[in-house]
Amino acid sequence: MPNRITATTAFGKGEVMDIEHRVKLGGRIHSKGVLILTAYLASVLGKTAQIPLTTYLTFEQSYSGVDGDSASMAECCAIISAISEQAIRQDIAITGSMNQFGEAQPIGGVNEKIEGFFDVCKIKGRTPEQGVIIPASNMANLMLRKDIVDAVAQGEFHIWAITHVTQAMELLLGKTAGSLPQTAAPSQGQYSPESIFGIAQQKLTALRSLVKTD
């Protein structure tokens, strides 16, 4: 069954508080995944100044152990959503690991995860916009049920295969992720103001200004 991941932010020092780890429900591989996505976020939003927020990350209504890194991309997208205050689509599921550069990495159980979300969609009510984001490197592992294959073929369900977490952000938040100009020095680099990273950058810059004023 799908899990719901949420992230909230408060004034802090750029840390990601892994609630599962704090209450001893998270395994070491999951904790490593959280540290890796923290490093990625610092590299895109904290090159020249500390991110002045602490993020609290959790699996909602999960009361058993959590391990593995297959939720890393989902957690990263949840954090970016919280920082930028841009809502995430709730009709798309995502699974996949990521490295410090944001590159998508394969995970296990991809068929079961897709089938689980598809079945939940059937129970809650199917719409043609629903689907699952997976790492492109898992495409060779797909052996899905016929009803799912048929739904995908008819455009009634979607499987998006991605190579980078920014592609997931764009699908989930409905905006371009943004990139820094290649010619810009790190201290002068600005993301497009309409992009996901640009919106997040503006909010962090405003918060840093308040901190300096105080």
Language model region names:
Residues 1-25, 29-214:
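Peripheral, non-AAA+ core regions of ATP-driven protein-machinery
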